Amino acid sequence: MRLGNAYAYCKPSQNVGLKLDLLRGLPGYVGHATSRINRLENQDNYSIKMMRSWPNAYGSALNCSVFDGHGEKGAQLSQLLADKLCSSLDFPEPSWDKQDLKKLVQEYARRFPEGNYWKHKLSTFEKFYNKFIKNCNSKQELLLMKEGDSAILGQNGGRMIFDKMGNIIDKIALLTELDRLRLFYGFARFDLDQCCGLGTAAGSTASSIFLYPYDDPNAPIDEGKDDDSWIISHSGLLKLIVTQVGDSKIILCDQDGIAHALTTTHHINSSRERHRLSIDPSRLDPDAFGETRFLNNFANTRSFGDVAGKPYGISSEPDIFSFLVGNTLHLPRSERSKLPFNGDECFLALVTDGITNKLADQEVVDLITSTVNSWGLKKATPQFVAEETIKFIQAIATKHSDNATCVVVRLSNWGNWPNVDRTGPQRETKLMNAQSNETKLN
């Protein structure tokens, strides 16, 4: 089975506005919904695409992304990203190398000479490249894991995971230097060439997943493997690559129904971001609403566009995380605990801050699982639960609530979580408060 090449996206000005080739090929496996909520315009966008030239034995990867635009031309920029960003990465082998990335940093330094960010990055390029691209091992990529989990890592940061035949599945890291270079260079190049031309009135976040089967890179490629059937019936482990720019979120639901945030938000209150931007926290003052903004203007410290902040460090350099997830049928029981989430995960949810500003991560997961538990697997597909998530946000929204977008990707253990709703009372309280406030206004 081979799915269509088209990606799916939603334009805010349309009710549905979808190219459906891909989604018709994935009934019940990818859900998607978006709404402007109470804003005049929906500046959110999303894309769902099969990448045909991703470097793996199957030759394809499922890419899903959400984009949250801001500024006068925010919708235009998020649409541009949905249309073209990940497509620009879809080729077998990058033709660029380390020196090309250095030249790109030089271009940024020439284009944005006002601040010191790009000059400093250029002067420390070797250190930056070695830390984040060349020698970025699994431990670095899995920085979201708790410190106690570091025991599962082998020497040099590698997970020593073995299959039932005793073969090493993941010896060092899931991503090569070339893989990381593809993402770093590709994002920065696209931002400079495509996004910065929109001027100061546009910016956007970008949160993406790239999902594909784990296979021995030295194994021969069978013709029969060059299809997309693994999305529906793959019985082994999957590589999950996550990239993050901004403050949208990617949440994973494990086999126990527990939420795991796979991304960190790029805000000025993050010590990691303050270090990157060389900012003294004592010089930061919250505004009248209690929010602290970078340069007294920007909610996010990383984004596409936002030209006014580019000289001072607002960049599209992505955080990159890699994980092994999926079906553990071929793993000995003793090896499953070495996986970051113990395998047999249930689903992924990609959501913009119009959702995460209203619901905690566990509430998002529980809203989805409880919807499936209530309606049943036949009715409550990923498409159904994505729409129900947006309906819930609409129900609890206030006058100034932000746009909301939700993409749900079904994984191997869909529907097999415990029948437990850990945050039902919290969601019910939010719903009752919203209804009470609406009654008072009327």
UniProtKB/Swiss-Prot annotation:
GO CC field: mitochondrial intermembrane space; mitochondrial matrix; mitochondrion
Compartment(s): Mitochondrion intermembrane space; Mitochondrion matrix
Keywords: Autophagy, Hydrolase, Magnesium, Manganese, Mitochondrion, Protein phosphatase, Transit peptide
Other observations noted: Present with 432 molecules/cell in log phase SD medium.
Organism: Saccharomyces cerevisiae (strain ATCC 204508 / S288c) (Baker's yeast)
GO terms assigned for molecular function: [pyruvate dehydrogenase (acetyl-transferring)]-phosphatase activity; protein serine/threonine phosphatase activity
Assembly and interaction partners: Interacts with PRO2.
Cofactor(s) the protein needs: Mg(2+); Mn(2+)
EC numbers, comma separated: 3.1.3.16, 3.1.3.43
Pfam family of the protein (one): PP2C
Protein name: [Pyruvate dehydrogenase [acetyl-transferring]]-phosphatase 2, mitochondrial
Null allele phenotype: Confers rapamycin-sensitivity.
Annotated catalysed reactions: O-phospho-L-seryl-[pyruvate dehydrogenase E1 alpha subunit] + H2O = L-seryl-[pyruvate dehydrogenase E1 alpha subunit] + phosphate; O-phospho-L-seryl-[protein] + H2O = L-seryl-[protein] + phosphate; O-phospho-L-threonyl-[protein] + H2O = L-threonyl-[protein] + phosphate
Function: Protein phosphatase that shows typical type 2C protein phosphatase (PP2C) activity. Catalyzes the dephosphorylation and concomitant reactivation of the E1 alpha subunit (PDA1) of the pyruvate dehydrogenase complex. Required for efficient mitophagy in stationary phase cells.
Keyword match rRNA processing: no
